[in-house]
């Protein structure tokens, strides 16, 4: 079966790379914020291949903004989902890369993905990162809004994926 989930992309590939907020237990210790080097490498590889890329670092843009979870057990550090949507509204894009670095972040990342896909149903949604690499089948079943998972180092795979989309070839 051929997969043409990218059929809505007709005017060139325009990509946003999103680093989501970080979630930690409310009463736990927080490690220092680490820069998203993997996303920086992916963005650089795509830019060098002449793809249009914009980045949103939801943690880096608001590292001290705390949002307490409804059950009062967790703290999200970074932009809220509403703020992420506001950032996206100022960008023209048809492909969204989302990084899931840590399994503890999956619940908030899944919620953000579902919210974004509801607001932008025609985007092509790509996920990568350590959590995705560790359990891609689970992630795609748990969040069917994901179109493709990139496993392991993402630089070459991301470039190959966008070339495939740009050339309107099958993903299979």
Question: Which sequence ranges carry the predicted segments?
Answer:
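Short glycine-rich His-centered loop
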Residues: 6-8, 12-33, 124
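Active-site-proximal structural scaffolding
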Residues: 24, 35, 151-154
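Short, solvent-exposed amphipathic alpha-helical segments in soluble enzyme
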Residues: 10, 32-34, 115, 166-167
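Glycine-rich beta-alpha loop elements in corrinoid/cobalamin-binding modules
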Residues: 45-49, 54-172
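Aromatic-acidic/polar surface patches that form glycan- and anion
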Residues: 31-35, 102-105
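Short boundary motifs at domain starts and secondary-structure transition points
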Residues: 1-9, 87-88
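Short catalytic helix/loop segments, enriched in acidic residues and glycine
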Residues: 32-47
